[in-house]
């Protein structure tokens, strides 16, 4: 099955070479890290993005401390990362099971750490509308606790997961970091407050941070049960099993879908940059393109149907979700210029890798 989908994909899609200067910059940083071991803290380490960060950093010979309360993270993600690595590299990982809403956990985790990659949060716009108190507790109190703990531990850099939801009702495309609208959900409010707190900590305490506004990140270890940008894994599972798919709205809603390897790259570049002008900034993390839900379905259907011979056609349309924006597309010129970011995967390459991972899970 996997060999079939690989041959189909690569006949039509060839990955572009990494000859540009931005990609060379990232390659140099990874090469340098292998021989220059640092201590990293990843909050939300058992989550989708957190576990991908863990895999990359351990593979680069780094020491990693991880924090997770397993409310949305999954121990299976950590087990999968362990299966990909040598026992020597895996021994560089220490897990602290705890919650970032507990300041004691945060201070313990930050001890002797060089870089913090703060991913822990309660994601999902619908969840925040249903339970704004829990979202506020995790995303604002937890964030503030981590800022205090990182400040007191004198970490070199605090990198955190911001969100494209911060753009709110601002309609103009592409989205540029310095122009935002009114938040459309409690989740969006919490992520904007994170940016405000990070800025205040720089002004008040001289603490350096970088915020990364993720645009619909997807990829391996994002399951159909994931609360964050769940449309892709839900649809993959449904198409594979020839089950019904629901499209919110008329199918023309569009997103700047960003494969998880691009998000990992952004975190590493942000943590290690020596460009002083790049510090204490907010950056879009995306590919600078957008795909409608209807086109996303067609792409996934094309990838999966040719492998399973299911010819999926069970599609139904329903109302728009509360709090959702109509269109989203990022301007990535700022992160490209200041952090030398260059996406390794666009939508087609990312979907191929994601579908391949899902097929491995169901074999």
Model-derived regions: residue spans:
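N-terminal Rossmann-like NAD(P)+-binding domain of SDR-like oxidoreductases, especially those catalyzing
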Residues: 1-217, 267, 271, 341, ...
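C-terminal substrate-binding subdomain of Rossmann-fold SDR/epimerase-dehydratase oxidoreductases
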Residues: 24, 33, 40, 59, ...
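Residue-level signal for the nucleotide or nucleotide-sugar donor/cofactor binding architecture
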Residues: 73, 101, 130, 138-141, ...
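Short alpha-helical segment within the cytosolic histidine kinase core of two-component systems
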Residues: 83, 203, 237, 302-305
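Residues in well-ordered alpha-helical elements
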Residues: 104-107, 114, 126, 133, ...
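Heptad-repeat alpha-helical coiled-coil signaling segments
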Residues: 145, 222-223, 253-255
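A glycine/serine/threonine-rich, flexible loop-to-helix segment
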Residues: 173, 224-233
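Hydrophobic alpha-helix immediately C-terminal to the catalytic Tyr-X-X-X-Lys motif of short-chain
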Residues: 193, 197, 201, 231, ...
